[in-house]
């Protein structure tokens, strides 16, 4: 079997001075040699068959095998998200509304009324502010959690610490929601303490669980396999990652659907039960973690590449200046090969660089992913509304003894139904017909339909204003029934369309965060995606003073318009990435672009993916 060296040395070589006598078909002969190389199968270091260039573009791609530990991690995510969302879904009513008149003193409402469950009675502005503070912290702490796992503790230990903190938070929330505490007016302090601790635990957990899941797939690069029916296919880690991410996000929303139990608990029994049920489900977490501990593929902390990451950017800034930042090839100035070609081997002042050319490519991909995540805050505002505005909107509609926050759960239910359709129906069908519905197209589509969700919210709010007994001051109305003659089920399209958008945006973002990050920064880059939610919460926090009647239509209209314009800009800015055949951190070449011989050999021998193989498993 010919190697790269064989292919090159077997081609005719002509000295510079004899080029005039070279045969006319020189280019054709060299092209023929490389073409022959392209079509020769090769084995990787594990003896697995790698595809030729022709096979890479013609064979159908499928998922590789998925270990059972990956499914157990998805189950762990279910338990954590169920306990998290089970609490979060009732935060709004707990803070905004007072204890209902004629209720049981635990926050539940009398039967047969249109009253809303409540406890503290602080109003929409305070409720939204505290909810956004919680969300901001829960999605800011992951930045620290990702760094801690990458550099100090590893993913598993960091997750275990987060789970312990999570348990303390659940206990504080339950104690603060006891009827005796609420009736004495002392519920605010334990609630605030509880959500702060809950945000810390969730942040440590969330930034590391999806990278740990994707760590369980140990296949690196493309592999050719013959199926029992004789069809030759490519086992593609990108497809495997997509399937894992879909399963993971599906379990996130199965857990979120647990909010259905807590919303009915607050309505019928009280908040002590609404917070107590998530705590019971939380108890599954330490048991499941103990069960899979010795079976997991664990990557030890190897020190974050964050320092090198910034030194690469700093070197490029010094050599290229700020004006050209972001242009194609900007970071190439930091490549050791470029520095050597220009007669220098130092970063600056003769100090040798401690990275290679491949790491600079990793930095490029990571920066692209992080800039993509900057578009997500506006999308998140469209997916569920600003603050607690949509839950508050439901309180001004006819509920007929249903909780006003029940429809939150239909977002999760929609995701649960949509993910299998995409995973086992739509995406395989597209791949079978060689239709590449790339990550940028998926995210753009999600952005657009989320904007539609906000537009529907604006129409619903307008109808409430037009039909409410209090007109354009419908929130907290006490005239007549106090609600507009509109069923709360008018909100259903908002939640369902938002759920569909998440299947395209959030799932794809998880894939990008993991696949485009350097090996020692995967937790940190994943946390950058999560931090987009924190930025969204900060934007929403700035908007909370405007969440008052008669202006509640505009918090839906503005994100819808911005989201539509942003989606168009986003697609034209990043559409080239749909042709980028990234495979788990960059192994692969641009689709349709013939890679260099050196790059092909690097891929086939595994050189380009050595950084992804840890020195040990612990």
Q: For the regions a protein language model found, what residue spans apply to each?
A:
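Hydrophobic transmembrane alpha-helices of multi-pass solute transporters/permeases
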Residues: 2-6, 10-11, 17-111, 118-223, ...
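Short, highly charged, low-complexity non-transmembrane loops/tails of multi-pass membrane proteins
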Residues: 586-593
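Acidic, serine/threonine- and proline/glycine-rich intrinsically disordered low-complexity regions
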Residues: 32, 229-232
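Membrane-interface alpha-helices at helix entry/exit sites of multi-pass transporters
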Residues: 225-227
